[in-house]
A protein has these predicted regions:
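Extracytoplasmic beta-strand/coil segments of soluble accessory domains associated
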Residues: 142-177
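Short acidic/polar hinge/loop motifs at secondary-structure boundaries
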Residues: 175-202, 304
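Short, acidic, small-residue-rich periplasmic hinge/interaction motif at the N-terminus
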Residues: 40-44, 77-79, 95-134, 143, ...
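Short, acidic Ser/Thr/Gly-rich low-complexity loop/linker segments typical of extracellular
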Residues: 46-61
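Surface-exposed extracellular loop regions of Gram-negative outer-membrane beta-barrel proteins
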Residues: 485, 510-557, 574-592, 707-722
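N-terminal periplasmic accessory domains that precede
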Residues: 96-101, 111, 141-144, 160-162, ...
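Face-selective signature of the C-terminal outer-membrane beta-barrel domain
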Residues: 299-327, 350-500, 507, 511, ...
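Outer membrane beta-barrel strand-and-loop segments of large Gram-negative receptors
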Residues: 413-415, 455, 461, 546, ...
Length: 772
């Protein structure tokens, strides 16, 4: 009898434990007998640590799952309503709060209604809850992101790009799973619960990630989803079209996505001024006056996805991708010596390129006991590259210079990664991981000069990172060990590194915080720069690889302050970066008096960047203004050169939305970059957009540079022996009109998506380019 009681008690305890690990909290928010749609619901601990959050659906309902036993506060707020806090003491089993009443209220600030999105500053991320108006007026996930105005994030709807003011890439995710921009373009705004913005990503996200934007969307269980996003110009061959299908069956999800991009213009040309200086003191300047020519590019991207989830315990995801890109460029110019303008030569350059990149991505995530998790990811990629270039200089049909080059490249790569995470205490977490990457590049160069290269590259890293919070102070300490190896015939390198990372933050209040971030990282030379290859550029210049390039060290420090006051918010950011022995360009004269452009490990490179960002709005739930400005100061030291450069830049944007209409106007000037001896001029452009949303259909228009008729980009080279300046013109980039249509339909989707937390990809072909 006692034995039976013990067994029954044990089973009961086990059931209680299992049940407690899946505690649910749900309810319905109502005001004056009407459901409150898009009300913000946040679950947090008694000391204000964020646990879960989101917004209510169209019927005022919300549900939070997988909550651990404990005592919490449930905070409910909504635009135009009084906030309400519900204490959930000793929560151990699922709880249905039923109908939760909140009262209407208007909060005025100088006769302007405060309707900004709720922002929660967590230790390692910002959690942003979209407002009801933002969810209703946005046409897709990208326009919603633009309306939410994340600090230091720029959204370009014309080019479908998301970038950061900081250096590095922006990772896009949905429920933690790596997402392409095509997924965001067909995401319904009403499916977005919140956005988690990692503006200081940890070691698990990689060394060169500027920010991570994670869309937390509603979980579904059954049904399917079909979406289309088309963006095309009626007068220029310019388009970006996306199509996605997802179908769910029990614990499985099947997905297909297709993207087509095309560009073709007939009024593209370039102007160059190049000076060549010889050892005897003589020199001359050659001028290239471009003639409008044709340039085109198009690409296809297809992805097949299958995922399987077992009740939140483990998750498997497999993705097969194929990307194909092809480009063609024709340049015609007149060439002459500045001192002898009557002696004109005709220059013709024709180049084509094709890249095919299939890949397989396998991902596994498992939740373990005691707040532990394990992630394993493996990605294999093959890149096939084919390109050719012809270049002639001469009079009529008599070429004086005739250059032809071809490149056939094959690159194979494998990336494997494992991550282990554990919650040590209620306010601290431990993360550790290993990553292994191996690449093999086999390239054949033909034409006037022929060669073959076989390059092997290996990178292995292991890291551990500990993060926590003490009252208003939060911290993170990380240490990464790495091994890098490169081999090409008898040349190569082996390098071991130990790299620390530190993040310290202090939150003065819910609306003001300050943060410091310091890190040391390594940058490896690209395979395309390390090949022992020479490619002729023109009659005077040669591009050469350098197999003696070595890994270099990057030191980076950032100090940031963020503040909010009613309708006003701002961000002050100061960053300093120092690179020791960076890989930068140099130009030398060889024994044949040819000017060889190559790369080498130079002395140092420094960048100082203060930036200020201010936001105002939304005013009366209609207008939002934002303005950012900063200064880039560069100090570039080579083995035989030293350059400094200062650039002031700005970006301004105004957004308006009223009922089903929304519009925006944004502009920015040149944000220039100086590296080595090259000054690269950033784009100076402005964009105007207007859209109308009706249920699942969104139609609109955008125009690029409607108020100017001269679009150009360019740069300068400050070499002692071969300085140059160039401008690239594209007439079609002025007054470019684009029509946009988004449509989606879902049927019975109730699928719960787990989080894929790593993103590995290889897109570097590893071939040396021969053009200017």
């Amino acid at each position: 009898m006692i034995k039976r009681i013990l067994v029954a008690t044990s089973l009961l305890c086990m059931c209680c434990i299992l049940f407690a690990q899946n505690v649910q909290v749900k309810g319905k928010v109502v005001s004056e007998n009407e459901a409150v749609e898009f009300a913000n619901v946040v679950l947090q601990t008694k000391d204000s640590i964020f646990i879960a959050g989101g917004v209510t659906d169209s019927k005022g309902r919300f549900m939070m799952e997988n909550i651990q036993a404990g005592s919490y506060l449930l905070c409910i707020s909504g635009m135009g309503y009084t906030s309400r806090i519900i204490s959930l003491d000793h929560l151990a089993v699922s709880k249905d709060l039923g109908v939760i009443m909140i009262s209407p209220e208007s909060i005025l600030l100088k006769e302007v209604v405060v309707t900004g999105a709720s922002v929660i500053n967590a230790a390692d991320r910002k959690i942003i809850l979209p407002t009801a108006h933002q969810l209703k007026s946005a046409g897709n996930g990208l326009s919603l992101l633009q309306q939410m105005k994340l600090s230091r994030i720029q959204v370009d709807q014309m080019r479908n790009k998301v970038t950061s003011s900081g250096e590095g890439d922006v990772q896009l995710r949905m429920n933690g799973v790596n997402a392409e921009i095509q997924d965001i373009l067909v995401l319904r705004p009403e499916d977005v619960i919140r956005i988690e913005y990692h503006d200081a990503p940890g070691l698990r996200y990689g060394d060169h990630t500027a920010a991570v934007i994670d869309y937390i969307v509603r979980r579904h269980e059954t049904g399917g989803y079909v979406a289309l996003d088309a963006q095309d110009s009626p007068h220029v061959l310019f388009g970006n079209n996306n199509f996605i299908v997802k179908i769910n069956h029990k614990k499985s999800e099947f997905g297909l996505n297709y993207n087509n991009v095309y560009r073709s213009v007939d009024n593209y040309w370039r102007n160059n001024w190049e000076t060549f200086r010889y050892e005897d003191g003589s020199s001359f300047t050659r001028v290239e006056d471009g003639i409008p020519s044709r340039i085109s590019t198009y690409g296809h991207n297809i992805g097949l996805n299958y995922s399987f989830q077992d009740q939140g315990k483990w998750f498997f995801n497999s993705t097969v991708r194929w990307a194909f890109n092809k480009n063609k460029q024709n340049n015609q110019s007149s060439l002459y010596i500045w001192e002898k303008p009557e002696e004109i030569l005709m220059m013709k350059e024709h180049s084509t390129g094709r890249t095919s990149r299939p890949s397989v991505d396998l991902y596994f995530q498992c939740k373990l006991n005691n707040d532990q998790s394990l992630i394993i990811n493996a990605v294999t990629t093959y890149i096939d590259t084919q390109s050719d270039r012809s270049y002639t200089e001469g009079k009529s049909n008599e070429p004086l210079t005739d250059i032809y080059s071809t490149v056939s490249g094959n690159k194979y790569s494998f990336i494997g990664e494992g991550i282990y995470e554990r919650k040590v205490t209620k306010k601290s977490r431990l993360s550790a991981g290993v990553k292994y990457q191996q690449s093999l590049a086999d390239n054949t160069y033909g034409g006037n000069e022929s060669s073959e290269t076989k390059m092997h590259e290996t990178h292995a890293t292991a890291y551990v990172e500990y993060s926590g919070k003490m009252d208003r102070f939060n911290y993170s300490f990380g240490l990464q060990g790495s091994y890098s190896r490169f081999k090409q015939k008898e040349e190569g390198y082996n390098r071991y590194s130990l790299l620390p990372r530190l993040r310290l933050g202090y939150q003065f209040s819910d609306n003001v915080f300050i943060r410091y971030r310091g890190q040391i990282s390594r940058k490896s030379p690209g395979l395309s720069d390390m090949g022992n290859v020479r490619q002729l550029i023109d009659s005077l210049q040669v591009r050469s690889g350098n197999p003696e390039l070595k890994i270099f060290t990057v030191y980076k420090n950032e100090l940031e302050a963020d503040f909010r006051k009613g309708l006003f918010s701002g961000n002050v950011h100061l960053s300093y970066q120092y690179q020791h022995r960076p890989i930068m360009e140099e130009t030398i004269r060889d024994k044949n008096n040819s000017f060889v452009r190559t790369n080498a490990n130079q002395l140092s490179w420094q960048k100082l960047n203060p930036e200020l960002e201010l936001k105002l709005g939304p005013l009366k739930d209609i207008l939002t203004f934002s303005f950012s400005t900063g200064i880039n100061y560069y100090d570039s030291r080579g083995l035989d050169y030293h350059h400094t450069y200062t650039n002031w830049y700005y970006r301004a944007e105004v957004m308006a939305s009223y009922k089903r209409w929304s519009g925006f106007f944004q502009m920015e000037n040149h944000r220039n970059n100086f590296y080595g001896e090259t000054l690269s001029y950033g784009e100076s452009f402005h964009t105007l957009g207007l859209s109308y949303r009706y249920k699942r259909l969104n139609i609109g228009m955008m125009t690029l540079n409607p108020f100017v008729d001269n679009y150009r980009m360019g740069g300068e080279m400050f070499s002692k022996v071969a300085p140059s300046k160039n401008w690239w013109y594209v007439k079609e980039s002025c007054r470019l009109f684009v029509a946009k249509v988004s449509w989606n339909i879902s049927f019975g989707r109730k699928y719960e998506t787990m989080q894929k937390r790593v993103n590995n990809e290889d897109s570097n072909a590893g071939t040396l380019k021969s053009g200017k």
